[in-house]
Regions:
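Positively charged, amphipathic and often flexible ligand-engagement surfaces
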Residues: 1-211
Length: 211
């Protein structure tokens, strides 16, 4: 927070904090940091994630259910994307919505489309996924949605950099996380077929696949 107060000035968001919303204390921590940013008149940089250390963090610190984590993540995302509308003195926010969850990213996109339709100012929000994971989600975020006002969605892919020794713990976590990716396989497969159909402009591709 000291670095944010020093460098996140004049509307610039340079320094970000990561908030792991599977931790029970993260909602209160985020609210506290918002107050600090408002009082200190600096921008708050937020990278919002569900969490990556569930096998090593003490269990009592983590939400009891996945639904509780989902709720905490989504509520925090909505709060950060709307707090400037009702509170003119609210601090500027730079939000990185770092998620592989389709429901959460669609929720944010729909919220921002509604804000555009109503002529409301938008918070600074970008999306991020890990390189090699949830690529179909990254692609969908850059595509236009029919009958909706459009914004320029900025999507980032996070790439690990360093020697094998330096990155070993990171790589082990990603290997563990990839086990959960199997649960998304059917969704990913459908998304990739739809992307292929769109690029080749073959409306009957999926129909032929099912025959």
């Amino acid at each position: 927070m000291d670095l944010m107060q020093k460098y996140n000035r004049d509307g610039q968001t340079v320094v970000y904090n990561t908030y792991q919303m599977y931790l029970k204390e993260s909602t209160a921590t985020l609210e506290s940091h918002l107050r600090m940013a408002q009082e200190g008149k600096f921008s708050l940089g937020v990278k919002l994630v569900r969490g990556a250390y569930i096998n090593s963090d003490p269990r009592h610190l983590i939400h009891d259910t996945k639904e509780d984590t989902d709720r905490a993540f989504n509520n925090a995302a909505v709060m950060l994307a709307t707090q400037h509308i009702d509170n003119p003195s609210a601090p500027k926010i730079g939000l990185v919505l770092a998620s592989h969850n389709k429901e959460s990213t669609e929720m944010m996109r729909e919220l921002r489309q509604e804000q555009l339709r109503r002529g409301l100012p938008l918070a600074d929000v970008v999306y991020a996924q890990l390189m090699g994971m949830a690529d179909e989600l990254s692609m969908s975020l850059t595509q236009k949605v029919p009958d909706l006002e459009e914004e320029n969605n900025h999507v980032f892919k996070y790439v690990v950099w360093g020697t094998t020794q330096e990155c070993m713990m990171y790589l082990l976590r990603r290997a563990e996380e990839n086990r959960d990716a199997v649960e998304r396989s059917s969704v990913s497969k459908q998304a990739l077929w739809e992307e292929l159909r769109g690029r080749l402009t073959l409306p009957s591709l999926l129909d032929r696949r099912g025959s």
